[in-house]
Design a protein with these regions (language model features):
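Helix-turn-helix
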Residues: 11-12, 29, 33, 37-79
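Hydrophobic alpha-helical connector segments
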Residues: 75, 89-123
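Short helix-capping/turn signature of helix-turn-helix
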Residues: 66, 129-137
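Hydrophobic/aromatic residues within well-ordered alpha-helical segments
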Residues: 69, 76-80, 84, 101-108, ...
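N-terminal intrinsically disordered/low-complexity leader segments
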Residues: 1-25
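Amphipathic alpha-helical packing segments from all-alpha helical-bundle domains
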Residues: 99-103, 122, 137-166
Length: 169
């Protein structure tokens, strides 16, 4: 009976340990790297195989964490949008629509110059590229793009309505 007890205990310990190599996957850094790759090379021009090779992450791992290529593209778009500063606070800073819009556009242009001064930064706008791709990107990515663009439009609509109510338009 002593041997059976030890065998059962050993089997329980083995079963409680995960089998295989430990997972050393960093979802955030994978999304950041994929975002830069899609932004640099273009979403349509970048295959899932290229992403896998460039990131040094196996395709099965990418599928496990993102479901499919569309899931990874969608995550990259979300990350890109979250990193772009919209400076929404500038749109209502002074209460004068013209002053606020000028400040907002000035800040956007300053950021553009600053980002393009860094040669390692991709040029262009990943979000607008995805808008232009339309149905060439997956359904989940299209929904992410739509949500991001709608958020920007809503921000401006809210500010313009406030300006109209204040008699500035």
């Amino acid at each position: 009976t002593g041997h059976a007890w030890r065998r059962d205990r050993m089997m329980t310990e083995l079963a409680s340990k995960s089998i295989g190599r430990p997972v050393s996957f960093d979802r955030t850094s994978t999304i950041e790297a994929a975002t830069n790759l899609y932004w640099q090379s273009g979403v349509a021009a970048t295959s899932f195989n290229q992403v896998s090779r460039a990131l040094g992450v196996s395709k099965p791992t990418l599928y496990r964490y993102f479901g499919d290529e569309d899931g990874l593209v969608s995550a990259a778009i979300e990350h890109y949008v979250s990193q772009r500063t919209l400076y929404a606070d500038l749109l209502g800073a002074t209460g004068d629509i013209r002053t606020d819009l000028n400040a907002w556009f000035d800040k956007q242009i300053d950021d553009l110059y600053e980002k393009h001064a860094d040669a390692s930064m991709p040029t262009g706008c990943l979000l607008m590229e995805c808008v232009q791709l339309g149905n060439a990107i997956g359904e989940k990515s299209r929904a992410t793009v739509h949500q991001a663009v709608q958020g920007i439009l809503d921000m401006f609509e809210e500010r313009l309505k406030a300006a109209e109510a204040a008699g500035q338009l």
